[in-house]
C-alpha cells in the first residue's frame, strides 16, 4: 500500500466539465496499483482508508471523460542516492515542494497557489519502498471528493 497525503486545500471551484484533452488509455475502468499510475490517469476513490494519511493499494482508473474523483498531474522519484525509506518530513518536503512546482503549472495551466484544486500526493510506504517503489504521484481533486468529468490538463483552475 502507498500513502495518500492531503497537504493543500483550496476553495472548491464549480464542477469541472471539460473536453477530452488528456484522457487516460483506460475506457471502462481498470483496477490498477497506485504505484503503476501515470500522469494523465484519472481514477476513482481509493480502496482503503484509515483516517489522516490513507494507505492506498488499488484504484479504478477510468477515461478522464468519464466520472472520476482524482487525476494524476505530475510525478517524480526519489534519487538513487536515497538508500533507506526517507522519514516523514523528507517525504512531505519532496511531495509538497514538487507537487506545487513547475510540473503542476505546466499540466494545469495555473500556479498551484492560484488553483482551485485540492492537491494531494501518493508516496511509498515502508512495504512498497522495500519492493523498489520510489515514486511520488501528485494528484488533484475537487477537495470534497466530489466526482467530475473531464481533465484538469490545461483547465487553468
Where are these regions (language model features)?
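N-terminal export and membrane-targeting signals
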Residues: 1-13
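C-terminal motif of bacterial Sec signal peptides marking the signal peptidase cleavage site
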Residues: 18-22
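Primary mode marks residue(s) on the alpha4-beta5-alpha5 output face of response regulator receiver
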Residues: 5-8, 23-157
